[in-house]
């Protein structure tokens, strides 16, 4: 978003150079141990001109290459275009030499199918109806996933996103739903541990 706005005033070339420079600084911080992931990076999540869209993808590809060279995971802020979004991102990862399991799709839908994730780990927005969709696709999932609220502590925008209490609430709802699917307690416990801890370790460390 910032890149796109700046491109309107300083031009795409200068805006891109500025952002690539910022990514370089961020990667230095990660190397020094001040952070563990590069993000959010991505492309406009709203409609832009075809030329601007192509330049955004060019920049994202370069950022992925930089992350790959530094062996750093990235978190992606992108548009919601169904399964096509992750398919495009997976293709960019492959071109950049960045393992798909090191590119986390932020604010993803609760559709966990391989067709929808294309092998990318996803951070699922846990709004209403998310548990039902997760349970209906859970057996078709091959990617790691976690829960998120995209919590925004901004007094000027109350209710803009889900509050942090949503996660324990949804975790309990997921456990109850899995019991109804005849999962035993041990299997549920292992699965919840994967959702809240193990996938983070395997992705970011």
Tell what function each PLM region has.
Residues 120-133, 151:
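His/Asp/Glu-enriched short active-site or ligand-binding loop at hydrolase and phosphoryl-transfer sites
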Residues 114-115, 131-139, 156-160:
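Short, charged, surface-exposed secondary-structure boundary motifs
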Residues 9-110:
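Divalent metal-binding pocket/active-site signature
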């Amino acid at each position: 978003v910032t890149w796109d706005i700046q491109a309107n005033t300083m031009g795409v070339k200068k805006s891109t150079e500025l952002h690539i420079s910022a990514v370089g600084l961020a990667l230095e911080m990660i190397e020094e141990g001040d952070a563990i992931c590069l993000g959010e990076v991505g492309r406009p999540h709203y409609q832009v001109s075809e030329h601007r869209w192509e330049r955004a993808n060019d920049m994202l590809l370069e950022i992925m290459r930089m992350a790959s060279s530094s062996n750093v995971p990235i978190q992606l802020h992108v548009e919601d275009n169904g399964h096509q979004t992750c398919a495009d991102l997976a293709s960019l990862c492959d071109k950049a030499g960045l393992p798909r399991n090191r590119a986390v799709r932020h604010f993803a839908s609760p559709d966990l199918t391989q067709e929808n994730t294309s092998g990318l780990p996803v951070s699922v927005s846990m709004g209403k109806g998310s548990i039902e969709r997760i349970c209906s696709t859970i057996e078709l999932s091959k990617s790691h996933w976690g829960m998120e609220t995209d919590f925004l502590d901004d007094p000027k925008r109350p209710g803009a996103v889900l509050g942090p209490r949503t996660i324990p609430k949804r975790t309990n709802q997921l456990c109850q739903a899995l019991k109804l699917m005849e999962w035993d307690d041990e299997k549920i416990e292992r699965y919840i541990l994967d959702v809240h801890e193990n996938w983070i370790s395997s992705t970011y460390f």
